[in-house]
Design a protein with these regions (language model features):
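Substrate/ligand-engaging "lid" and interaction regions
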Residues: 1-525
Length: 525
């Protein structure tokens, strides 16, 4: 049986798959008559997280409007994963214990491509007074202005960049009476609302300067009572479609569950598989109202609290643990993160980094408990066998990640004084492990290709001449790296950690098959 509106009626009696009970036809009529929510970015994080929130409100009778989703970059997603299935999708929640929840999501009322016809639909929606918010999951690159400066010379309605198109759509709303609206980035990048606001304002300034827009439009954009750009923190892993999940759905009676690659290399399917844990924290600044998403688990708070939650996640409770697992996971030749965390030594290592060295200096938000967050990460999220995240994916661009994932913690210890930073063991051990990784030889002595990193070639060049079992001149080779504040937030020698990292590195490079012995030695202290 193919996934479509007709199937929903058939499946309502089945306990294995949860189906919505609301009248979707009625919801569609109400939504198109007076839309409240437009979303840009039709990928998995939207389908597997954002759309499920509104689905819950509809199911609970707390809203009578759905979402209109727009795809501007990879319109094949609409053609292959939305239109053939009446804009429905199966949300599959992958749990740590191996069980799954399957639910049909019906909250997407219309899917729009950025072609000529779609463009006219978007202008119509933006001009509607009822529109409360426009949200985005377009990745951090989507907010770039520098790549599209040629757009400044075009007419606004002919813009080729999403940020230019968004600016023009906001201008259409302004010209139609200037009703308030919230423009909300839900992308996984810090200060995302600021990035979005700066991009829109830059386009507006350039077009105003060239006489293509009214000067007063800038005032409209800069008044938070009329146009707001709330910040947010989002956290949920929604990997590409999993073949095991596909097989499970076919066994459950779905006929067509193809996993297809679009022409722009996006893997799509009529289903989305995702982990069970999810967080969405949003600055509560919505000048035209908003759906009551707090009833679906979204946390609404101040901008300061959003930023504190982001720092907690990125600097202490998730990302540093990910990087530690990725480094030693690559060295020990693990293919997935759940395999890596299944090694008791690596599990202990991330526990020590998180609980013992991270939590004492964590940026602690009021709305999320850092201890509980780490506990979920270590006990539920990282060991999830369905997620299939790879150490080799996470290890990419580590030179850019180190200053945030470990540097902020090191700076916090430095500010405390009393030589507390010198007492750290496990963060310096991870730094030594990263230098060991840069040699391009795993623990068994086999060569591998070091992952992509903008500073990778320079760092590897600095370590030339160091081999397993031949590690003279360690200080000479490591000093330029360990003293580099742009890598670690501090000069590791000046804070009393440089020599310690050198010592750990010497042990990690003493021979083949020593890494687990070194980890065991320091974890047992």
């Amino acid at each position: 049986v193919k996934l479509n509106q007709e199937l929903v009626t058939t499946l309502k009696s089945q306990k294995e798959i949860r189906c919505f009970n609301y009248d979707r036809k009625k919801i569609k009529t109400a939504t198109l008559a007076a839309p409240i929510w437009l979303h840009f970015g039709a990928g998995n994080i939207f389908r597997g997280f954002i759309a499920t929130l509104q689905n819950q409100l509809l199911e609970d009778g707390k809203s009578d409007k759905g979402i209109i989703v727009v795809e501007t970059y990879d319109t094949g997603i609409i053609d292959l994963a939305y239109k053939p299935y009446d804009d429905l999708n199966v949300s599959v929640t992958l749990k740590r214990d191996g069980s799954v929840n399957k639910e049909i999501i019906g909250s997407v009322i219309e899917s729009v491509k950025s072609d000529k016809e779609g463009w006219q639909r978007l202008i119509h929606f933006f001009e509607e007074d009822s529109l409360q918010m426009v949200t985005f999951t377009i990745t951090e690159k989507g907010y770039s202005v520098s790549s599209y400066e040629t757009d400044f010379e075009r007419e606004p309605e002919a813009s080729e960049s999403l940020m230019g198109q968004l600016t023009y759509l906001c201008y259409c709303r302004y010209k139609k009476g200037g009703k308030p609206i919230a423009v909300v980035s839900l992308d996984n990048c810090s200060q995302n609302g600021k990035k979005l606001q700066e991009a829109v304002c830059k386009f507006a300034e350039e077009w105003i300067k060239r006489g293509k827009m009214d000067a007063a439009f800038k005032t409209y954009l800069q008044d938070p009572k009329r146009v707001s750009f709330p910040w947010s923190m989002i956290d949920k892993i929604t990997p590409q479609p999993n073949k095991k999940v596909q097989e499970m759905l076919i066994k459950a009676g779905f006929e067509e569950m193809p996993i297809i690659k679009t022409s722009k290399n996006t893997w799509v399917a009529p289903f989305v598989n995702a982990e069970e844990i999810q967080y969405l924290v949003i600055e509560d600044s919505f000048p035209n109202g908003r759906p009551c998403l707090e009833d679906a688990g979204v946390i609404f708070t101040t901008r300061e609290e959003v930023e504190r939650t982001e720092k907690m996640k990125v600097c202490t409770c998730l990302n540093p643990l990910h990087t530690a697992l990725a480094i030693f996971g690559c060295l020990l030749d693990y293919k997935t993160i759940d395999e890596a965390v299944g090694n008791p030594l690596l599990l202990q290592l991330i526990e020590k980094i998180g609980y013992e060295e991270g939590l004492p200096v964590v940026t602690s938000p009021a709305m999320v408990n850092p201890y509980h967050f780490i506990k979920e990460v270590i006990e539920i999220r990282l060991p999830n066998p369905f997620i299939l995240d790879s150490p080799w994916r996470i290890i990419a661009d580590t030179s850019l990640k180190m200053p945030i994932r470990f540097g902020e913690t090191l700076k916090a210890y430095k500010r405390q004084g009393e030589n507390k930073i010198e007492q750290l063991t496990y963060i310096p051990l991870v730094i030594a492990g990263w230098c060991r990784y840069l040699l391009g030889i795993n623990d068994a002595g086999k060569a591998y290709e070091v992952g992509p990193d903008p500073r990778g070639a320079i760092l590897q060049k600095a370590l030339e001449g160091l081999y397993l079992g031949k590690n003279e001149n360690i200080s000479l080779k490591l000093a330029p790296i360990l003293s580099d504040e742009s890598l670690f937030g501090v000069n590791l020698y000046e804070v009393g950690l440089g020599t310690k990292v050198e010592h750990y590195f010497a042990e990690l490079t003493a021979d083949k098959n020593v890494i687990q012995k070194v980890l065991d030695k320091y974890l047992m202290q």
